[in-house]
Amino acid sequence: MTSKILITGGAGYIGSHTAVELMNAGHQVVIVDNLCNSSIQVLDRIEALAGKNFSFVQADVRDGAALDQIFAQHPIEGVIHFAGLKAVGESVAQPVRYFDNNLGSTLTLLQAMDRAGVRRIVFSSSATVYGDPETVPITESSQLQVTNPYGRTKLMCEDILRDLQASDPRWHVAILRYFNPVGAHISGTIGEHPNGIPNNLMPFITQVAVGKREFLSIFGNDYPTPDGTGVRDYIHVVDLSLGHLAA
């Protein structure tokens, strides 16, 4: 069964890959993005990869009137909500900006969805809500111990969604917590290309590989690992996109 899905932040790293996978699965897609951390060129690449047209609206998800217009013009059946700011360090320096953007966009979106009678949403949360876990691997029941404003905005959005669904069983909500997505579409035409200074490790590595940076500094030599440097787990962005499709 095909549906028309609204993707907020759909021009971004995970959103663009998810848009391709949705269209490959036969769904129709509408993307809303303010392009604050993505490029307009990504839209043409999404269309070329999927071999299908989709609708794009350049708008901030905090703009309720813009969302109302989208829902009025398209028979949206569900929403995947990626839009938001995501840099941990930046959130510590600019907490109010993060609360305004991440909470404001979620609240405005939910209100617009309710007005339109669209009550299916997949929310892009983060494993940041677990803070520094005492045991690994992390499970859904692991203790939540947020350590930064970014993670706190994600957890607060989760709480909003839980309270909303508890108050109105017509809502269908899926919350996905993940971290460290890497990789790119097999074509290489879309991947992680953030505007400005990257917030993740892999873009720095690729910039060194292609000569945009001379070197990459590795910090820390006393971790409990064979060589003392840090170790991280990663998830491929296409696998993550397929997870959103399944949700």
Positions of PLM-derived features:
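N-terminal Rossmann-like NAD(P)+-binding domain of SDR-like oxidoreductases, especially those catalyzing
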Residues: 1-184
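NAD(P)-dependent short-chain dehydrogenase/reductase
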Residues: 162-245
